[in-house]
Every structure is written in structure tokens, then in C-alpha cells.
Amino acid sequence: MNTFALLLAALRVGIIGLDTSHAVSFTRIMNVDKDPEVEGLRMVAAYPWGSRDIFSSTNRIPKYTEEVKKMGVEIVSSVDDLIAKVDCVCLETNDGREHLWQAEKVFKAGKPVFIDKPLAHNLHDALKIHELGRAYGAKYFSTSGLRFAPVAQAARSGDYGRIRGAALLMPAPLEEQGTHNFYTWYGIHGFEPLVTIMGTGVDRVSCFRNGTEDVVNAVWSDGRMGELRLMRDYWVYSGYILPEKRAEGESPIVVFSKSAEGYKPLVRQIARFFKTGVPPVSPDETLEVFAFMEAAEMSAKRGGEPVTIAEAIAASTDAPWWKFW
């Protein structure tokens, strides 16, 4: 098939939000790189906004706009204009406060959408998006790319047998203007792989905080335990997994290691989702990750007192917690 025919056959993908480097990286993978697992997708249009008032995001928009234009992306003036030009959407806006209204427009249009992290700036809006997704029968998913770290995926697939526990050391800088809940801005990169490794079913959470780090201890409904050490002044991704069955003297499994793959594992999952309509992670699981983060924040504010997932959801909505599962 010649290049012109390939362009005609490609799924047209659009970006909402050019305030994150993800937008540029995803465009490069789809439009420039020759990754066979992403073949059949092309980024064709972008709506730049995006945060309106988070400086660390807004100051990127002019530069990233020019970069995606050089890769063949048309810049449009509204979300509605974007939706009219594409088959699928990557909602990349770095500001989770904007996601509720932006996602609803895509849901209404019936277009499949990947909502990049964070799904929302707090659990309240995450629950609203979850409800809207159900109401519209929307095809969507949201995740941190660290869910697709090879070892995390191997653990989730059962390659190491039943997982007894895991402990992760992760960076968790804050959004300096205070627009997001404590962990939704960046700390999600720790919570997401921990749930990937351990599976769903977090029951209760304790969190202890000082000026530079938080230690989150979580207990699953079956009694297993996982831990996060979230650092605000130490930029490292590390951790280990403890399988239930391990030979005596054998070291724990290291979760993260250097990889040249970058965002490709995530974009491959997005491509598969756009082609099949089957999300690699369910909205229910994403919601549990958000409730996990909210419970940790509530616990930290109470000096480490345990908080249940059900309590975190109840504090963010008038609906009963079980309505969301």
C-alpha cells in the first residue's frame, strides 16, 4: 500500500491539550516512528488548551504547538472542532481540573478517548467522569504509563505467582499552586504500579508525612500489604516485589530498570484500544486508584489514622460507595 493510501486508511487521532510533553512524544511515535504496533494511527489535529493558569503547563504550549505542527498536526480553535476532525482522542491536558468538561464533550460525541493522568484533579471529579462514562456508554481508559513497566505487567499476568507484597520508592512533587489533591498531580505514578502489581482490592490505608516524604501503607481485603515511599526531593523510581513462593536466598524482584522504550508501551496500548475498543485497564480500577490516593491524603491529615476506601469515596460524593462498582 502506498503512503497516500496508508494515510487514508489510518485512524485519525486528535489531541486535547498541548501543555505536556506527552503530546509531542505521542505524536512522534504515531507520525514519525516506524513502530509496527502503532501502525494504522495518525495524529492529525490538536486543540492546544490545556491549563489556563498553571504556569509550568501554560508556558509549554507555544513550543509544543510548533513541534506538533512540524509533524503534520493541524491546530484547531476548540474541542468541538477537534472532535469533528478525528476518529479517536487523546485527552492530554496536564491540568486535571479541565478533564471533566473536556471528557464529557468527547463522551457525547461517541469517540473513544484515552484520558492521560490524572483522570481528574480530585476524587470528586473522577467519580463524576466515571458516572458520565457509564451514562454515555463511553469507551475510555485512563492510566499512568508506569502501569506498563514490564515487571509490573509480568506480576499482573501471574508470571511470578501470587504476590505477597510490594514496596515502591517513587518521586511525588506537588503542583506548586495547590490546584490538585496531594497525589493526583504526580504521586499517581506510585499508586498506579502498586495496584497493577498487587491487583485491586485495597481496603484501608495509613499515611505518614513529613516535609520531604510520605510513607503509605495499604492493606488489601485479603490481608496482603503494599508500601509506597513518595519523595518530594529525591527523583528516583525503584522498588521490589515479594512473590509468595520464592527460593530460599533468592532476591526480591526489582520493579523498575532503565528502558529505551519511553512512552512506546503506553502508546501501543492506546493504539490497541483505539483499534479494538477494549481498554487495557477498566474505569473501575482507575477509580480505585483515585480512591486509594484520596484515602492516603485523608490519613496523612489525620496523623496516620487508617482510612478505608469506602470512607474516601463517601467523603467525595453523596452516592453510596458501592454504586461505583
Regions found by a protein language model. Give the residues of each.
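Hydrophobic alpha-helical targeting segments used for export or membrane insertion
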Residues: 1-11
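N-terminal glycine-/serine-/threonine-rich beta1-alpha1-beta2 phosphate-ribose binding loop
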Residues: 10-109, 131, 135, 200, ...
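Hydrophobic residues in well-ordered beta-strands that form the structural core
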Residues: 77, 115, 140-142
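C-terminal helix-rich "cap/oligomerization" subdomain common to oxidoreductases
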Residues: 89-93, 273-325
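Short helix/strand-capping hinge loops at secondary-structure junctions
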Residues: 110-112, 117-118
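A contiguous active-site-proximal alpha/beta segment in oxidoreductase catalytic domains
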Residues: 119-177
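Rossmann-like dinucleotide-binding domain that binds NAD(P)(H)
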Residues: 167-236, 284-291
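C-terminal substrate-binding/catalytic lobe of Rossmann-fold NAD(P)-dependent oxidoreductases
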Residues: 213-266
